[in-house]
UniProtKB/Swiss-Prot annotation:
Disulfide topology: none
Top EC group: transferase
One GO cellular component term noted in the UniProt record for this chain: chloroplast
UniProt name for this protein: DNA-directed RNA polymerase subunit beta'
Record-linked HAMAP family: RNApol_bact_RpoC1 (MF_01323)
Molecular function GO terms recorded: DNA binding; DNA-directed RNA polymerase activity; magnesium ion binding; zinc ion binding
Cofactor note: Binds 1 Mg(2+) ion per subunit.
UniProt keywords, alphabetically: Chloroplast, DNA-directed RNA polymerase, Magnesium, Metal-binding, Nucleotidyltransferase, Plastid, Transcription, Transferase, Zinc
Predominant place of localization: plastid
Localization terms from the record: Plastid, Chloroplast
Species this protein is from: Brachypodium distachyon
EC number(s) given by UniProt: 2.7.7.6
Amino acid sequence: MIDQYKHQQLQIGLVSPQQIKAWANKNLPNGEVIGQVTRPSTFHYKTDKPEKDGLFCERIFGPIKSGICACGNSRASGAENEDERFCQKCGVEFADSRIRRYQMGYIKLACPVTHVWYLKGLPSYIANLLDKPLKKLEGLVYGDFSFARPSTKKPTFLRLRGLFEEEIASCNHSISPFFSTPSFTTFRNREIATGAGAIREQLADLDLQIIIENSLVEWKELEDEGYSGDEWEDRKRRIRKVFLIRRMQLAKHFIQTNVEPEWMVLCLLPVLPPELRPIVYRSGDKVVTSDINELYKRVIRRNNNLAYLLKRSELAPADLVMCQEKLVQEAVDTLLDSGSRGQPTRDGHNKVYKSLSDVIEGKEGRFRETLLGKRVDYSGRSVIVVGPSLSLHQCGLPLEIAIKLFQLFVIRDLITKRATSNVRIAKRKIWEKEPIVWEILQEVMRGHPVLLNRAPTLHRLGIQAFQPTLVEGRTISLHPLVCKGFNADFDGDQMAVHLPLSLEAQAEARLLMFSHMNLLSPAIGDPICVPTQDMLIGLYVLTIGNPRGICANRYNSCGNYPNQKVNYNNNNSTYTRDKEPIFYSSYDALGAYRQKLISLDSPLWLRWKLDQRAIGSREVPIEVQYESLGTYHEIYAHYLIVGNRKKEICSIYIRTTLGHISFYREIEEAVQGFSQAYSYTI
C-alpha cells in the first residue's frame, strides 16, 4: 500500500477505536460485518484450513489462494457485481491473496487495557498527563488498589464515611455481609473505579488547554521563587520545573495531532495480518509458528474467560473478575512488550517469547533490517581499511566491486568507442578482464562519485560522497580523518557503497555530500574531521621518542656499540653507532632512515635555524664543552648551542627523533599549502 500511494514517510502513533474498526471491518452482502477475531484457533487439524473467526480466518483476512474462496469456488471472469465479490456460502472475498499482508483484524477487549508503551515508557506519558506517580498508576492498573469515582454530587457511601465514623464503627457487624450480596456489584460499579478503566476515565476528563495554562502558571511561580539556599529544595524545584515543561509539551502535541489522551487505553486490540506472523509446515509434521500467534492466543483465551465471567457477574465473585482483568492486562502487555513486567515471558521450552516490540526494535528489527537495511541495485559492501595515500575526498574501491557497479557504463563506452559490436561481446571482455576494460573503467570512475554509508545512519554524516579510485585487494580504502563522522574504526567495520545514477543525485553528491565539504558537525559546529583512534596511536608512536633523556648516551652501558662503527657521510653529516648522530638537514636524516641506519625513535641532533626563543631562554645548560680553538658547546636538555671564541652563536642543534621530523614536515607542508591557497583567494 505504501508503493501504491507513494508515501514518503512512516509514523507510529495513537489511533481511535473507530479507526481500528475501519481497518478491519468488511460488510458482506447479507449485512453481516466481519473483522473481529473471537477464537484462538488457527488451522483445523484435519483439513489444514483456517478456522472461522480465528487468527487466520479467510473471511477476515482474505483468501489463501488468489480468487478462490474457502469452498474452493472461484469468481466468474468479468463479474463486477458487488454481490459476487464475496462467496455466498462461506463469505470469503474473491481477491488477491496478497491482501493477507495488509488486511487487519481486531479483538474486542472485555475490559479496557492500558498500552504498556505509554504507561511504562521513560518518560511515562500517562503519568505525565495525570501528574501522578507511576507506582500508584501501576497499582491501579493491576488491581492493587482502587479509588472513589466522583460520579455524582449527591452524598455517597464513601463520601459520608468521614462524617459518620462512630456510626459506621458500631455497624461493622451489619456492613460486612453487604460485600457478599449482589447489591455490592451495583455499588462497586457506581462508586469504585479500578484497573485500566479508571485510568481511561481520568484521561477522558482531562482538558488539555487547562493543563497547559495551569502548568505555565505553576512554572512561573517556581521561577519567581528563585533559590532558597537549601540544596535539596532547590533540586526538587528544578525537577518539578522540568516536569512541567515536559507536561506542557506533551499536552500541546496531543492538541496539534488531534489525538485524544484516552486512546492510550485500549478497548480494541489490532490483529496483525497473517502473512506478517506466518505458520510454516515442515517435513515430519513439524510446525514452525511466530511467537506473536501464541501471544495472541493467550490474549483471546483470557479475554473470552473474562467475557464469560462478566455475563455471569451475579454468580462470579468480584475478586475473581478483578483477577481475570489483571490476567488480560498482563497478556496484552506481553504481546506488546515481553519484558515490560521485569522477566520476559517464556514458553514450555524456556524460550523467551518475541513480542511486537522485539520484532520492531533493534538491529534485526523490521525497520532497520527489512525496510532500511534491504539490498538495492547498484550497491556493494565490504570491510574498510586505512588508505594512507588517499586524499580526504577519495576512497579506494576493489576491482571486483568497481567493475560490478560501473558495468553498464563500461559496456556503453566499449560500444561507443567501437571496441565491441554488441553487449554480449562487451560482457565477455569484462569477464576476461582485458586491459581496455580497466582503462575505460578508470575514465568512467573519474567523473562519477560514489556514496559510502555505515549503519546505523544516525545523522547526515553517516553517508558521504567520495571520488573512487581503484585499489588492489577486496577491501574499501578510506581516509582515517572521515571516520569520526561515520563513527567507524578499522577493527572489521563494514560499509556499503552506492552509485548515484541520475544527474540530480550526482549533483547533490558533489555539492552537498562530498567529505571535504562536511568538516564541521551539523549539530554543534565543532570540527568533525579530527584524528581519532588509529591516527592518534600512530602519531603517538611516531613522536614517542626516547624516554631515557639526554644522559642515556653517556651512562647507557647496554645501548652503546663501542666496537662497531658505521659511518654515514653526506654533506658533512656524520653518523656513528657509539654516539647520537648529527645531521645538518632533515633530508640527511631521512636518507639515513631509508638506509636503515636509524629508526623512527632513535635520538639524533639536527641543525636548526637560529631561534631567539631558545637563545633567550633562562635554562641552565647541563654541560659546557670547550675546544682548543676557543669554540664551545652548551648542551641543554633538548638543544645544543655552538659558539665561537667571540661568544657569538654559530649554530643550534635540536635533540629530536626522525618521527618528530616527519610529523613537523607534514604540518609545515600543510600550513604552506593553506597559506598559498588563502593568498590566491585574496
